[in-house]
């Protein structure tokens, strides 16, 4: 009986210590987790519109990438570069729906910026934190993201 109580207490301590560390969520097989979101790199080239549509079909709530910190960008670079080498991936930032302002396709606030130039759609270089304005009809690789 004493052993059971000790083991139960041990599991409780582990559960409490893991709360708030991201251990309370799980991404589907093949997806990577960061800051309570799931990410997946697809080795497929698509236009911006096709890439966004593709992401929405991969998982409920999934969209092209939206970035909210340089640390998040670094995480994505660490996932994309080994697979895609030096290239571009579409991110969910565009002014496709709004002619005046850029916005994320997942509806989140534009609170982190790292691009130059003006174009309807934005792509991220897989080697660094730089964003580039590109024609939405160009084909680039796809990385999808959703909140876990």
From Swiss-Prot:
Summed up, the tissue specificity of this protein is: Expressed by the venom gland.
Occurrences of domain C-type lectin (ranges): 34-145
One GO molecular function term of this record is: toxin activity
Q: Does the keyword DNA damage apply?
A: no
Chief location category: secreted
| Assigned keywords, A-Z | Disulfide bond, Glycoprotein, Hemostasis impairing toxin, Secreted, Signal, Toxin
Q: Which PANTHER family match?
A: MANNOSE, PHOSPHOLIPASE, LECTIN RECEPTOR RELATED (PTHR22803)
Q: What's the protein here called? A: Snaclec stejaggregin-A subunit beta-1
Q: Which organism is it from?
A: Trimeresurus stejnegeri
């Amino acid at each position: 009986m004493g052993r059971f109580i000790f083991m139960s207490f041990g599991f409780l301590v582990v559960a409490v210590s893991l709360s708030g560390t991201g251990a309370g969520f799980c991404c589907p097989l093949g997806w990577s987790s960061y800051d309570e979101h799931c990410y997946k790199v697809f080795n497929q080239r698509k236009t911006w519109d096709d890439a966004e549509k593709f992401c929405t079909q991969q998982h409920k709530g999934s969209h092209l990438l939206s970035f909210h910190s340089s640390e998040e960008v670094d995480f994505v670079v660490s996932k994309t570069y080994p697979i895609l080498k030096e290239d571009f991936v579409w991110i969910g930032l565009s002014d496709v729906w709004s002619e005046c302002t850029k916005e994320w396709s997942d509806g989140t606030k534009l609170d982190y910026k790292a691009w130059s130039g003006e174009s309807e759609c934005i792509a991220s270089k897989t080697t660094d934190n730089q964003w580039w304005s590109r024609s939405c009809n160009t084909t680039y690789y796809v990385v999808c993201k959703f909140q876990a």
